[in-house]
């Protein structure tokens, strides 16, 4: 399988899967996403890590933190101020009748460019430079109801694999040894995530109970 990641820059939303395979090669892995498409993951060269979202044999999403894309004029290592001078980041996303306020702590911006949403990620420790981006068609993005996906084992495993890839791309950039998969570490991380989720749910419930109690006292 000959991989040519330099051709990734020419892949665009709407291209077909055959074009992708013929230009950059077969993926190292195919992951589930929180949307209806699957990520074709290219991680053989971590300095040129990229993912292509494929739905019904067509490209609906692109991600990279190592290669620019001709689909957008935002380039890696650009400054956040430069991006914001050119585009106005979205302040909220509307899902049905609900508006979800975007509060990114200046770590990313979501831009509306043509028929796509573009999420631009910034490295707040490196002069707020663009360190990655995700392009997704509005049609593909609309398949997610709300902001957060429904969890399942396959999606969890995909997120875990992608997290390891992203950590290793950063380690590669900083000339550090890459991390290998550890079942023990994965089990520990899952347990920690479950504990945190339970704590968050409890905090939300406690807040709701307090609000209800205050309202009940006022009525009395």
Residue spans for each PLM region:
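Functional surface patches built around histidine and acidic residues
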Residues: 1-220
């Amino acid at each position: 399988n000959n991989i040519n990641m330099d051709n990734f820059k020419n892949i665009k939303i709407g291209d077909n899967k055959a074009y992708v395979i013929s230009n950059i090669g077969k993926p190292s892995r195919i992951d589930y996403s929180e949307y209806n498409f699957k990520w074709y993951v290219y991680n053989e060269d971590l300095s040129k890590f990229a993912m292509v979202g494929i739905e019904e044999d067509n490209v609906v999403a692109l991600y990279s933190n190592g290669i620019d894309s001709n689909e957008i004029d935002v380039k890696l290592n650009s400054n956040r101020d430069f991006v914001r001078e050119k585009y106005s980041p979205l302040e909220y996303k509307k899902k049905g009748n609900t508006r979800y306020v975007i509060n990114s702590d200046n770590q990313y911006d979501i831009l509306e460019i043509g028929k796509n949403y573009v999420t631009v990620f910034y490295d707040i420790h490196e002069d707020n430079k663009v360190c990655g981006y995700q392009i997704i068609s509005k049609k593909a993005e609309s398949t997610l109801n709300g902001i957060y996906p429904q969890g399942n084992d396959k999606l969890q495993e995909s997120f875990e694999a992608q997290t390891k890839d992203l950590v290793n791309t950063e380690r590669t950039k900083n000339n550090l040894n890459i991390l290998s998969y550890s079942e023990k570490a994965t089990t520990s991380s899952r347990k920690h995530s479950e504990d945190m989720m339970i704590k968050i749910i409890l905090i939300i419930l406690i807040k709701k109970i307090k609000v209800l109690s205050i309202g009940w006292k006022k009525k009395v």
